[in-house]
Amino acid sequence: MIVDIVRGCTDENAENYNQSAEEDDGSCVYPEPDPVFGCTDPDAMNYDEEATDDDGTCEYMETIPCNGMAILCHRPYDQVTFPETHNAFSTHEDNIFYPASNHRTGFQAQWNAGMRAFMLDTHYLNDADQSASNVRFCHGDSSRGFSPCTYGNVDPWVWLGKLESEIQSEERDIVTLLIENHVEADHLKALLDDVGLSDMMYIHELNSEWPTLIELINMDKRLVVFWEQPSETSHPYFHDFLTFGWTTNYADDSTSSMDCNPLRGDDSQPVYHMNNWLKNQAGLSDPTRSAEANDVDFMVERAQECIEDHGKRPTFLAVDWWEDGDVVEAARLVNLIEVP
C-alpha cells in the first residue's frame, strides 16, 4: 500500500508551520521583523548600522565654521576656548586713559580681530541718580572714595548696540559677556532689552550639560551672560559666574607666577577663565609687559598646563592690552589641542 507523504512547512518558526508535515515543501512564510528606526545614512555622524528604517534623525558634520572653526560646531560650549578682553570698554579710543585703561582700541577693533568674549563693568554715573538711564560702563572702585566713573565712562547703549549689530551679522558666532554688575538687575535687563540682546540670551540649568555651539546657533540663543551678583535669582539668564564657573588668579606679578589654580568660584564646574594679564608695582595693569603675557607660545603652553591640571581646556583666555601678542591665535591653537 502506498502512503502519501504529507508535505508542508516544517519550520516551527514559520507562520504557517504544519505539525503534520513530514516533508518541507518550501512554502514556509515568516513574519516581518519589527522595524528598527534610526539613521540609515553611513555618511551621517549618528549612523546606526542596526537601523532598518530611517527616522529622519541623521546628523551631519557642519562644514560652515562656528566661531571661526568648523570643528567647534559640535563641541559643547564649555569645551571651546574663546578669546576675551578684560574691561573691554576701558580703552583709549573710548576716552578712558591710564591708569584706568586696559586697551588702546575699542569694541569694533576687538570684534574685527576675533574677540567673542568681553568683560564689562556696570555702574551708575553718580550715586545721586541711580536710575536705569544713568547706567554706564566705568572702570574703578567706589571704595576709594570717589566715583568709578571719575576716569571716564562709556555709553552702554552705544557699545552694546554695536555688539547687537555684529551678532546679527555673524550668525555662526557665540558671544559671551561677563559683567561685574553694580546696578539694579532690572536696570541691566532693561539695558539689554533696549539694544535688542535679551531675546538672544541663553538660560543654562546648573549642572546640566552645556549645548553645542551649533545647538545654540539653531536655537538662536547666541549670547551667554555671566555676572557677579549671586544673591539675585529672578533673572535666570544672568548666570552668576562664581556659581556656574571659576577663575584663576588675575593681575599676577610675573608670567612665571601664573598658574592654573582656582582663585574664586566652583572649580567643579567646567567653565573657567584663564586670566592672563600682569600688574605693575602700583597694582595697575602693566602695558609695558603685555607683549610678554600675550605671547602666543606662552599662552598656549599655559593653557596646556591648565588642561593637564583640570582635564579640559580653559573656556576663556582673558587679556589686557589685547593689541600686543595675539590672543585670538592662541585661542585657535588651544582649540586644536587634543583633550583626553
What spans do the regions from the language model cover?
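Catalytic cores of phosphodiester-bond hydrolases, prominently lipid phosphodiesterases
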Residues: 62-340
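Primarily marks secretory-pathway-exposed extracellular/lumenal segments that are disulfide-
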Residues: 1-63
